[in-house]
Amino acid sequence: MLSFVDTRTLLLLAVTLCLATCQSLQEETVRKGPAGDRGPRGERGPPGPPGRDGEDGPTGPPGPPGPPGPPGLGGNFAAQYDGKGVGLGPGPMGLMGPRGPPGAAGAPGPQGFQGPAGEPGEPGQTGPAGARGPAGPPGKAGEDGHPGKPGRPGERGVVGPQGARGFPGTPGLPGFKGIRGHNGLDGLKGQPGAPGVKGEPGAPGENGTPGQTGARGLPGERGRVGAPGPAGARGSDGSVGPVGPAGPIGSAGPPGFPGAPGPKGEIGAVGNAGPAGPAGPRGEVGLPGLSGPVGPPGNPGANGLTGAKGAAGLPGVAGAPGLPGPRGIPGPVGAAGATGARGLVGEPGPAGSKGESGNKGEPGSAGPQGPPGPSGEEGKRGPNGEAGSAGPPGPPGLRGSPGSRGLPGADGRAGVMGPPGSRGASGPAGVRGPNGDAGRPGEPGLMGPRGLPGSPGNIGPAGKEGPVGLPGIDGRPGPIGPAGARGEPGNIGFPGPKGPTGDPGKNGDKGHAGLAGARGAPGPDGNNGAQGPPGPQGVQGGKGEQGPPGPPGFQGLPGPSGPAGEVGKPGERGLHGEFGLPGPAGPRGERGPPGESGAAGPTGPIGSRGPSGPPGPDGNKGEPGVVGAVGTAGPSGPSGLPGERGAAGIPGGKGEKGEPGLRGEIGNPGRDGARGAPGAVGAPGPAGATGDRGEAGAAGPAGPAGPRGSPGERGEVGPAGPNGFAGPAGAAGQPGAKGERGAKGPKGENGVVGPTGPVGAAGPAGPNGPPGPAGSRGDGGPPGMTGFPGAAGRTGPPGPSGISGPPGPPGPAGKEGLRGPRGDQGPVGRTGEVGAVGPPGFAGEKGPSGEAGTAGPPGTPGPQGLLGAPGILGLPGSRGERGLPGVAGAVGEPGPLGIAGPPGARGPPGAVGSPGVNGAPGEAGRDGNPGNDGPPGRDGQPGHKGERGYPGNIGPVGAAGAPGPHGPVGPAGKHGNRGETGPSGPVGPAGAVGPRGPSGPQGIRGDKGEPGEKGPRGLPGLKGHNGLQGLPGIAGHHGDQGAPGSVGPAGPRGPAGPSGPAGKDGRTGHPGTVGPAGIRGPQGHQGPAGPPGPPGPPGPPGVSGGGYDFGYDGDFYRADQPRSAPSLRPKDYEVDATLKSLNNQIETLLTPEGSRKNPARTCRDLRLSHPEWSSGYYWIDPNQGCTMDAIKVYCDFSTGETCIRAQPENIPAKNWYRSSKDKKHVWLGETINAGSQFEYNVEGVTSKEMATQLAFMRLLANYASQNITYHCKNSIAYMDEETGNLKKAVILQGSNDVELVAEGNSRFTYTVLVDGCSKKTNEWGKTIIEYKTNKPSRLPFLDIAPLDIGGADQEFFVDIGPVCFK
């Protein structure tokens, strides 16, 4: 909502702009053309603007200030025109004139209708005292006075016995009134009309805009191998190579800063090779380098020995579960149980902690070349290759079967208008119907289609002034105002009913990496993983023997998995790792229960103005108007200004069938016809112009779940929410995806240029060097940020029994849980140590029994515990620490395929696959409206890992392409850890001699190197083309299966595969345990201002303004003449009046008056707004909805209480109940008085509305009180004087079905102010009962149950006092 100051500023700006425009035209001169001939008389003009209101009726009560009235007519319009005007059409609307002086008093109007009753006047002055009248008869007993002050507290009574358990409370009251819902769905489609005569085919429409991209199709069948592409053009020559062959690889020097390039020197003579320089100091640890290309497969490692399998012990006998005993000594490890039945698919397991790098194995001897393996699974999808040459067009596909009916599309463009139908036969005359009610004046019909332009007529005389137009339809709702400041959090509502299980949420963004967990036990050797980035240099191993370099063999198939090794002992806790990259956001957690209301925080700053909201929905379509008679076509007048849109008219009667008309112009496009058969794909149409954004249609029916959308942009950081409940400890997450490739490091400084040595001949490839020395371990990085809880892992092997945790605090009583699915058969764990006895928790309500799980194998009998006192069922304790490793169980059956892991980082580009078969043409999409150009989206996240595709055939090697331009230098990377020294590569062929580089600075003299043997100088050869891949060798004999080898080095990560189809929705997880209550959150910010109140009645119309002369005067506008008449200068009277009116309306919103039109929320709000007011009856509206359900209450400003009276306030006196049976409590409203409990209605408000207001009243208060007076005759109400006990005391029923009694639990006992019903005297007495509580949900009283009634001489009646909330 615009602020008061904003509104005023905007209005003043608009007035200033208009004045500036008028003044800017002062100096312009208008050229006069020759006067035209006078034309024929024009048609009747369009309806004029709304006329002025009639004279006022008799004065009603003053209402709140309304908005400004309609503008007055522009003054002196006729006089502003002369014969030299440009045209006779109406000029633009004049500025609003200043408010004129009051007009002369009009003639008295006719007698008005009786106005509504005015509000009660102020009380008159007290009249003089009258003469004393005669003494009247004695009056009836007066109403009871206000309750006296409470007496002094009596002596403390004996503690009564523990009361019986109370009944469960009633369900909570309804929640807050919801905000107004969206417009309902469109109604059902009407019956189809009779088929019209087939019109001539319309002109073909323009090509529609391309439809939205369809959902991704299923993978097509494997395509045929395409023909090899043509050889590429020969690339241009490469740049000049470096001088001479590469020398031996020295150790890396420290990276220098890049120097500025020097001037190009002349080519110098080739110098002799200088001595090798000394090794530089050790460089800092660099970042992991970019993934290199896939190397040749390594030699297979030697197979490890299979460990011996331990013998399984006999299963123990299942002991009966004993009561919790004292904490015993840990028992011995039980024997492994028998193999369990195959379990259900577990959830993805937690991320294992990264194991330490193993020592590098010795290279094995080269094995014989194996036979070619069977075709492997299709590799992961590589990045998109370059576009291939266009293939020949495929044959047209078979026609697809019709798809399932789609959701209703958006309204299409209107079709071509058909020719008019032939005139139908006249129907029989209908029976005359009864006279209908007088209809309201019909609204002008919609503007008809524009006729053909007539020949221009002569300019006619000015037409008569048209009739006064009807008021226009209410405008569409304006744009949604900017969001106000954040409001204070409301009181905690009652929990609503449990909603249906929602659809699984989208995968969230990648969350932050969690803290490094404690180092887990080393897992069993896994299969060969993908090659990771180079790890830090390991500890220097002993020098291995150098094996002979074997010939590179074909990549062998992965060997069978080795048997699972025994679980190792838990390692020491590792150092904290460096901060990881932010991981994807975890899935959205379930909504926590709302926290309690916090204290009010400081008011935040006013937020910046939000963008305009989308246009509101279209209003309801009006009814069609009456068809008017066809008039004779007059000559075309000049185009008038568009009039205001009239209201829709009453539907006309059915006309006679007309003659077939001439063929009309091409009409507006019609609605979409029924869905046709899919046509062939049309040629793409030209891009349409960006259309205006259409108005939002009504919400359609919910569509089926769409395909997974791309991740949205990361939103701005929202305000910190209140602290949630502490979740249970999450299971360890799955291993994180491989990080993205790091940025390229900065180029090192140029090294010292040595003198150029003679070009040596290319030497043979040297053997691999020994591994370098291990680097020292780096310092631990700072602790990482706390990660989001990982996804639930797959079910791990049963762990050993953990140490018993400390007893948990008693949790609150849990709600009744949903019936859980049948659990898996768990593996047999070790007998746990007996935990300490926890304090008894509240007993939760019993949930429905789950299906019995399959019997687990018997566990080992635990030690006999001491018999503990049986405690109430406690909630689950906190999760214990991880116990010692259990004995390895027998190998289970292989589980089903697990859920796909998170997507890996983008791998190196794969080879270009063969093109797939052309798909069949899809159905033509419906025309979409052209959208506005959106901003470029951010890079999407990597897609899900797809299923492995079929391998494509290897394409022929293309010729080398031209070298690309140099890319820009990337930003400087952080210093990475020093990588291991790679094996020496083979010496490449020497390049051509390059030009002589600039002289470097003088290097430090190195130690003298040993003289090398001088080789013969060879000629530098040209770089040869890549050879074709050789054919696979002949398959050898299938060798015996070797023992499983040790884990080889991780292979390179393959490219990401195509996205697989979305998996099925997972099952609903088990409900989590109820967490402990969170800390009370801080009080929220003040809420936004409420919606504006209804506008007041329009003010009287302004008097005729001075107006401006907008006709041409020959030289300049009349408004720009010297300002002799001050009345022509527009003042901002109207602006001031509007601003005052707005100010008053805002003022009434902020300070409620306690009237029916402007009620307060509670009496406390009234007292704060008007501290000078006195107690009395005022109107309040606790639910703050429409003021029609406001209630009239008594406000006690001395205490700030809001008091609501019962209706009726008393139950009449009589012998209500006759019974000779045993005495018992009988409810007055429920049993005796035919089910009518006490009611608290207010005039003009229904009982349901009153119940809602009472519910809000209870939520807004934190204290309530009420009293009730029991009038008795021979009936005990509280204490029986004969026996001295309270067994005959009445019972009261509170609002939440709680029973308030005379003795027992102090929270549910009432107090007695006066007890006059303690003995039977055959006379009337009374007992006044009062109940005060800080739980307002227990009041007001709804019923009373006396015990001592039923005799012929026993009577009673009840006065119900008001219930007061504070």
Curated annotation (Swiss-Prot):
Prolines at the third position of the tripeptide repeating unit (G-X-Y) are hydroxylated in some or all of the chains. PROSITE patterns: NC1_FIB. Residues 59-71, 1089-1101 have a biased composition (Pro residues). The modification 4-hydroxyproline is found at residues 47, 50, 62, 65, 68, 71, 102, 108, 420, 441, 444. The modification 5-hydroxylysine is found at residue 177. SMART domains: COLFI. Changing residue 109 to D: In OIEDS2; decreased N-terminal propeptide processing. Disulfide bonds join 1163-1195, 1203-1364, 1272-1317. The keyword Membrane does not apply. GO terms for cellular component: collagen type I trimer; collagen-containing extracellular matrix; endoplasmic reticulum lumen; extracellular exosome; extracellular region; extracellular space. Glycans are attached at residues 177, 1267. Residues 84-94, 538-547, 775-784 have a biased composition (Gly residues). Keywords: Calcium, Chromosomal rearrangement, Collagen, Disease variant, Disulfide bond, Dwarfism, Ehlers-Danlos syndrome, Extracellular matrix, Glycoprotein, Hydroxylation, Metal-binding, Osteogenesis imperfecta, Pyrrolidone carboxylic acid, Repeat, Secreted, Signal. Residues 1133-1366 form the Fibrillar collagen NC1 domain. One of its GO terms (biological process) is skin morphogenesis. One of its GO terms (molecular function) is extracellular matrix structural constituent. The modification Allysine is found at residue 84. The modification Pyrrolidone carboxylic acid is found at residues 23, 80. Trimers of one alpha 2(I) and two alpha 1(I) chains. Interacts (via C-terminus) with TMEM131 (via PapD-L domain); the interaction is direct and is involved in assembly and TRAPPIII ER-to-Golgi transport complex-dependent secretion of collagen. Belongs to the fibrillar collagen family. Type I collagen is a member of group I collagen (fibrillar forming collagen). This is Collagen alpha-2(I) chain.
